[in-house]
C-alpha cells in the first residue's frame, strides 16, 4: 500500500511510503528515493511546525530525522520487532527464537548480566522472516528454520555454517503454478521430532 503524506508548509512536497520511501517536490510529477535504515515503510509523522523533523515507522522499528530525511537515527537503540511466532529452548537463561517481519530470524536471551538485553546479545537463527524454527530444546545447536516458498535452512550455531535442506530445490517466486513441481505455503510449519 502507498501512504502519501505531505508537509503542511509546502503543498508541492509529497512522501510516499512503501518498500522504498519516495519524495516529490513538484506535487507528484516526479519522485526520488529517500534512503531509510529499513524497508517497508508504514507511517510518517512530519512536525507541523518544523517539516525537517520526521518520524518514520517501518518493519524494523522507528527512525527520527531532523533534516528532512537526509539522515535518520539508528534502530539499534530500540527493542522493536514484529514476530510471526515464538519458540523457546530449555537452557537457563532460556532463549527466545522467532522470525521477524521483513528481517531475519533471531535468537534472543531471556536475560543477561545486569546491563539489559540489546542487539549485541542477539544472534541470527535459521530461516527468514516467516520462520518456524525447530531444534532440540535441551541442546539447541542445530537450528532448522523455514522461509517462504518452502525454503528450509539448517544452521549450526557453533560453526555458524548453514545449508539449504529444502525438499525440492526450486524458488517459485515469479513462476506460474502450472510450472511448479511442488507448491508451498507462505510459511510451512517445521517441528523437531522428540525421538
Label every PLM stretch briefly.
Residues 165-182:
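Surface-exposed loop and turn segments in beta-propeller and other repeat-based domains
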Residues 5, 24-25, 65-66, 108, ...:
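Conserved Ser/Thr-centered positions that define the repeating blades of beta-propeller domains
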Residues 109-115, 156-163:
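Short loop/turn segments immediately following beta-strands, especially the blade-tip
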Residues 45, 87, 126, 134-136, ...:
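Conserved beta-strand position repeated across blades of beta-propeller domains
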Amino acid at each position: 500500500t502507498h501512504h502519501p503524506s505531505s508537509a503542511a508548509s509546502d503543498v508541492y512536497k509529497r512522501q510516499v511510503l512503501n518498500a522504498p520511501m519516495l519524495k516529490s517536490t513538484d506535487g507528484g510529477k516526479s519522485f526520488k528515493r529517500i534512503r531509510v535504515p529499513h524497508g517497508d515503510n508504514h507511517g510518517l509523522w512530519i512536525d507541523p511546525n518544523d517539516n525537517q523533523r520526521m518520524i518514520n515507522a517501518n518493519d524494523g522499528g522507528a527512525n527520527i530525522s531532523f533534516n528532512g530525511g537526509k539522515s535518520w537515527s539508528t534502530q539499534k537503540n530500540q527493542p522493536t520487532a514484529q514476530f510471526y511466532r515464538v519458540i523457546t529452548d530449555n537452557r537457563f537463561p532460556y532463549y527466545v527464537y522467532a522470525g521477524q517481519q521483513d528481517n531475519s530470524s533471531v535468537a534472543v536471551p531471556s536475560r543477561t548480566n545486569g546491563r539489559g538485553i540489546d542487539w549485541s546479545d542477539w544472534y541470527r537463527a535459521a530461516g527468514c522472516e516467516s520462520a518456524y524454527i525447530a531444534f532440540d530444546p535441551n541442546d539447541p545447536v542445530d537450528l532448522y528454520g523455514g522461509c517462504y516458498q518452502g525454503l528450509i535452512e539448517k544452521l549450526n550455531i557453533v560453526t555458524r555454517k548453514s545449508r539449504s535442506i529444502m525438499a525440492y530445490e526450486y524458488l517459485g517466486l515469479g513462476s506460474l503454478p502450472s510450472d511448479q513441481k511442488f507448491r508451498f505455503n507462505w510459511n510451512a510449519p517445521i517441528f523437531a521430532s522428540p525421538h
